[in-house]
Amino acid sequence: MPYMRLARIAAEAENAGAYGFAAAAWKAAAGLALRESNRQWAEERCALCENALRREWGVIKPEKEK
């Protein structure tokens, strides 16, 4: 699969909040990138998605009962 197709899939997953899948897709895209700038971009997006996953961005937690 070419870089651009995988990058598009990664971006769509990221926009949908599927950060685990997006991080894996960005990592794979980085490995396919022919241009250094594309590789760096994909690595940065992967790192952002991994951070979002760790910090549970977009996860709605139930309120604790008092």
What do the PLM-derived regions correspond to, one by one?
Residues 46-66:
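Alpha-helical linker/edge segments of TPR/alpha-solenoid repeat scaffolds
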Residues 34-42:
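Boundary/linker segments of alpha-helical solenoid repeat arrays
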